[in-house]
Amino acid sequence: MPSATESKPETRKVVSIVGPTASGKTGLGIAIAKALEAKGEQAEIVNADAYQMYKGMDIGTAKASPEEQAEVRHHLIDIIEPDDAMSVARFQEIARAKIAELQAREVRPILVGGSGLYARAAIDDISFPGTDPEVRKRLEEREKVEGAGALFDELKTKDPEAAARMDPHNPRRTIRALEVIEVTGRPYSASLPHYRYVIPTVQIGLDLPREELDRRIDIRTKQMLENGFVEEVERIRPRLGITAGKALGYQQVVDYLDGLCDLNDTFMSIAQKTKRLARKQMGWFGRDPRIHWLQALNPALLGNAMAIIEHADAGDYDAIDAQADAYTQHHLGDIA
């Protein structure tokens, strides 16, 4: 029987830990799972980092170590080969199935990952319409002949809601919107992402002063070199597909192996690009008013996170979260 502070399985929210790279998400996820276990509740981690799903890409993606995975069971790590392609639509299907499986066993899923769209795809009202190369090509040809303005005028007629949320000077997005309308027969606006949970969730964000985050990224980049990242890339390079090859750091090391740059410049570039990625991630996550931000350096981090989870399970944030989509679209605009 649940104690006064222990939630019932049917009220337990999925916990999603978000934040920039190197902010400590993996460590907090493990700590939360162990704290829940101490209260008599089982919890397991579901990876939401796009590149940690690839086998053999361990050092460059900062994958949870074997020791960390032994502490708490992890899911959706090492599930595809480097020459396979993981898309956010494919991940959404896999992740939701895994979450449902865990919940059926009364195990609380803890979603951990730095890929913002992937984390949201698992829990939010987001759909991913298919593409049609022939339709896309025809629209691109029309844009060259008629101009972007003509296509945007067509979009305003076919889907005024989508047009109102889009930049008229971005023909790529206009073409995508018209493509979706033609392929699906539905308004493009129906597929735009919403800040609306389809799986009850509480999101915890990790924040760090920029100087500390930069310091951690520098340390991590140095450790990547020391731990054999060059050898990792050399080993998997023959099987590195287009999608997996987009993981930050891998192409830089490939260029080094091809003699296009020296080792020091390679890892300096990786550190600089990682810092830029971290800024971008903070901008992405910063738009979501449902995230409960915690200072990662606070000694009381775990206790604060557990308190947020307890309040979420009690339904204390439900009313505010329900207003998030309307608030975000009104104040910040569309992000798609």
Swiss-Prot record:
Keywords: ATP-binding, Magnesium, Nucleotide-binding, Transferase, tRNA processing. It catalyses: adenosine(37) in tRNA + dimethylallyl diphosphate = N(6)-dimethylallyladenosine(37) in tRNA + diphosphate. The record marks 115, 136 as: Interaction with substrate tRNA. GO terms for biological process: tRNA modification. Gene3D superfamilies: 1.10.20.140, P-loop containing nucleotide triphosphate hydrolases. It comes from the Bacteria. HAMAP family: IPP_trans. InterPro entries: Dimethylallyltransferase (IPR039657), IPT (IPR018022), P-loop_NTPase (IPR027417). It comes from Bifidobacterium adolescentis (strain ATCC 15703 / DSM 20083 / NCTC 11814 / E194a). Belongs to the IPP transferase family. This is tRNA dimethylallyltransferase. ATP binds at residues 19-26. It is an enzyme of class 2 (transferase). Disulfide bonds: none annotated. Catalyzes the transfer of a dimethylallyl group onto the adenine at position 37 in tRNAs that read codons beginning with uridine, leading to the formation of N6-(dimethylallyl)adenosine (i(6)A). Its EC number is 2.5.1.75. Its cofactor is Mg(2+). One of its GO terms (molecular function) is tRNA dimethylallyltransferase activity. Monomer.
